[in-house]
Amino acid sequence: MQTVLAKIVADKAIWVEARKQQQPLASFQNEIVPTQRNFYDALAGTRTAFILECKKASPSKGLIREDFDPAAIASIYKHYASAISVLCDEKYFQGSFDFLPIVSQVAPQPILCKDFTIDPYQIYLARYYQADACLLMLSVLDDEQYRQLSAVAHSLNMGVLTEVSNEEELERAIALKAKVVGINNRDLRDMSIDLNRTRQLAARLGPDVTVISESGIHTYAEVSELSHFANGFLIGSALMEQADLETAVKSVLLGENKVCGLTRPQDAQVAWESGA
C-alpha cells in the first residue's frame, strides 16, 4: 500500500480517533438495530445488478457534482438501482455519514456505506446512520482485520462488499469466503483505469460469488460487454458528472437507443425488467 491510498488510510485513522472522541460508541451503541434490508439478496438473481453511487468528489477528479443533493439523487436512483452506494469519506470525497439516513429515507434499497473502513467503530457508526452494507477493501486490510470487521457487519445483518484490485487480493477473498466481490478497475496506487481487470479476475470466482465490476464504467456498451464476466456494476462518476442525472442513468444502464420515448421512471423500470 502506497501513495494516494496510503495517505487516505493514514488520514482515515486520524479521522476515526477524532470521531470517537466527538461521538463515542457508548453514546449510540444501544440505539443500533440490525438492518432488515438484505444487501446479498438485492444483488442476487440472474438480472444484472446495479449499485448506483452518490459521490460529490474524488481524489482523481476533484469536485464532480456541484449541486450535490443526496435526496434528489436517491429519488432518481431508486427506480433503477439494486442497491445505492453513499460516499462517507469527508476529506477526499466530500462525503458524510449524514448522507446515509437521507438516502435511506428516500430509497427502499439497501444502502452501502462507501468508506475506507479500518475500525469496527466505522461499521457501528454506519449502521447507526442507517447503512445496510459496508465496503471492506483487501488492499488496506489484512485477513485478521477483515474477519473482525466482517463479523461485526454480519452481526448487524449488514452485507459486505469485499473489494479486490489484483490477483493476490482475489485469492484472499476466495479464502475468506467473501459473498460479494467487487473488482476495482481503478488502481488506487496511481489512479489508472483498466477494465481488463474485471475480465481477468472474474473468471477465477465461483458461481456462488456475486461479482461486481467497479470504477471506469461509463457506457452501456461497457456494461453489455462486461456483463459476460460480472453479475453487476458499481457506477458513480459517469452518472454524477452529468447535469441530467436521469438521462445519464438510462443511457448507461439501458442504452440510449432502447429507451427512446420513455420519459417516466416507471416506464424505464418496466423496459429494464422486461429485458429492453
What residue ranges belong to the model's regions?
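Catalytic cores of alpha/beta
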Residues: I118-Q130, S165-L176, G216-I235, M240, ...
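Glycine-rich phosphate-binding active-site loops on the catalytic face of alpha/beta enzymes
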Residues: Y128-Q145, G182-S192, F229-V249, A276
